[in-house]
Amino acid sequence: MCGITGFVSAPAAHDELTRAVRGMCGALEHRGPDDAGEWVDAAHGVAIGFRRLAIIDLSPAGHQPMVSASGRYVATLNGEIYNFEELRRELRAGGLAPEFRGHSDTEVMLAAFEAWGIDAVARFNGMFAIAVWDRRERRLYLVRDRMGVKPLYYGFAGDTFVYGSELKALRRHPGFDARIDRNALRLYLSFLYVPAPFSIYEGIAKAMPGTIVTLDPDARTTRTTVYWSARDAAIAGTRDRFAGTEEEASHELEALLRDAIRIRMVADVPIGVFLSGGVDSSLVTALMQAESATPVKSFSIGFDDIGYNEAPYAAAVARHLGTDHTELTVHERDALDVIPRLGRMYDEPFADSSQIPTHLVSALARRHVTVSLSGDGGDELFGGYTRYFVGQRLFRWIARTPRGMRPALGRALGRIPARMYDRLRPRLGERAHKVARVLQANDIDAMYFELVSHWTAAAWPPHSTAVAPVLDRAQWPALADPVERMMYFDQISYLPDDILAKVDRASMAASLESREPLLDYRLVEFAWRLPLSMKVRAGKGKRVLRRVLYRYVPEELIERPKMGFGIPLGAWLRGPLRDWAEPLLSEAALRKHGLLDPAPIRAKWNEHLAGRYDWNFYLWGILMLQVWLDAAA
C-alpha cells in the first residue's frame, strides 16, 4: 500500500515540475515511508509521483514510478494485485511476458497493459488505485478497484489536471483552489461522509469504484468507463440464483473464502489480522490460521464500558484458534490524544466515530506487522446490520399505525430521555430516538434513508441543491426485496465512502496496509447469487457465513447481540470529551466559517448534555466538520 499523485499541465521546466510533484508526494509520506520517486516528462507537462510502503519485492526492482519493458507505459500502483502470479503465468504461457526484472505485482501489471491494453484491469483481482501514462497515445488513465477499497481523487487546478490518493496531496499543487463545495457539504451533513463522486472541494471528484478515468490532455476533458459494477453484479446474481442447499452454498463459499484469504496472505513482510470476536473477523482469523503453519498475529482493542467492550470475546476466539494475540484497552485519554489529528488524517469531513478505535488498533498492529487483514464487508454482503432485519418489521409496524397518529407517537417516544431507555438495555435510547424520527416515512426505502441520514434542511448550508447520484433510485437494479435494496445502497455508498475510507485513512496514518478478503469481487458476485434467506432469516443475519465459521469456532463463542466497532461517544461527550467539544460548538465557533446555522446545533448540544436525547451522531458530525475546517485553514 502506498500513495500516488501527479499532474498533467502545459509543458514546463523539468525542475519546476519535479519540485511541484515532490511537494505533493510529501503530503503522502505516511502512506509510504519506505521510498519515494517521481517521473517527469517536461515536454508534455507530465509529472508522476509515488510514496512506497514496501510489501512485495522489497528490492530496488519494486521502485515506482515504473516504466514498462517497451517504454510505452509509466505507472504507479497503490494497493495490491493479488492474482499477479497467475497473470505472470498467463503472460508467459502466451509468449507475452517480458524479461522480468523483479517479482512485484506492478511489473506484472505493466506487462499486462502491454499485452492487453488498459482493459487488462478487468483481469486484476485486488485493491488498487492506478495511474498510467501512455506515452504513445498521450493519455492518462486513472483506475480504481471494483469495491472502492483504495481512494482516488482527480480534477482540475486551474489549467492543470491533478490526481492523488488523498486530497492533501492535491492541495499541495501551486494552482489548487480550496473552495468548499456546498453541495458536498450538504451531503456530508446528511450522511456524515461525502459520497462519491463528490469531494469536499469544488472541481475535484472521487473516482467511482470499478471505473477507468481517461484524460485527453489536448481537449482537457475526461471520460469515465465502467469495467465492473455492483449494479451489474446484483442484476446477474439475482437472475442466476444459487440453486443448491444452504449447506452446499456454505461449502462453495468456504472454498472462495479460503482462496481469497490465501492470496491476501502473500507478502514479503510480517502479516496479521484484526480480531473483534464477531462473525466476520473471527471467520477471517480462523481461515488465516488454517492456512498458516505458525500462530497468526491477531490484534484487538477493548473499552472500560462493558456495552462496547468486545475484547473478552476476541480473546476467547484467539485462545480457541491458537493465535498470537495482542490486546489494548482504550481509555478516554487515548481518544483525546487521537482527536486533534483527525482533521488531517481524514482530509475531508468524515464522522464515523469508530475512526478512533480503528486508528488505535492499526497503530497497535503496526508495532508488530506491516499488513493486517480485516473482516470489513461481511455486513454489507451477507446482511449483518440490524437495520436489515429490523427495518422490514419496523416499517410494517409503522404502516399499520394511522398516518395522523405517527407524529404524536414519534414525539412521545422522543420525549423519554435516552438514559431511561438505556436502563432497560445498553444503547436502547439511541435506537428508540431514531425510531421516533422515522415515523413519517411513506415507504421502506424512504424509511431506510431516514435511518441512515442525520442533519436535515434546517442545518444545510445555503445555496446547496445536490443529490448524490447513488441516491437516484431510478438507476438502481430492480431488486424486489427491500432488504436487498438496503444492502445494495450500502455496497455502493456506505461501504466505499464510510467504512473503507475510514479503514484506509486510519491504517495508512499508522503506515499499515489493511486487506479485506471478504471484498474479493468473486465473493461479492457469489453473495448476490444467494437467496436472501441464506443471509437474513428469523431476525439473524449472515446465516451462511456463520455456517462456515462454526466449522472452526464453537457457536457459543460467537452468538451474542451485535455491538459494532464503536466507542461510548454519547457518554464521553457528556463527560471526558465535553471540555474539548464545548468551544467547537459555541455560537461564535459555529458562525466562524459562514457555513452553519448555530441554532439547531446548539439546541441538540443542550438536549444531549441534559440527557433528554442521544444526539451523539449528529454532534460528532459537526465536531468533525469543525476540526476539519480548522485543520484545512
What are these regions (language model features)?
Residues 38, 151-154, 283-286, 381, ...:
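Generic hydrophobic alpha-helical membrane-span motif
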Residues 131, 349-361, 401-407, 587, ...:
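Short, basic, helix/turn surface patches
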Residues 146, 360-420, 477, 494, ...:
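Active-site adenylate/phosphate-handling loop in enzymes that bind or generate adenylated species
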Residues 340-344, 366, 387-390, 572-574:
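Short low-complexity, flexible loop/linker segments enriched in glycine and/or proline
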Residues 271-280, 305-306, 353-356, 381, ...:
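Glycine-rich loop motifs involved in handling phospho/adenylate chemistry
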Residues 1-346, 358, 362, 551-557, ...:
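Cysteine-centered catalytic environments shared across enzyme families
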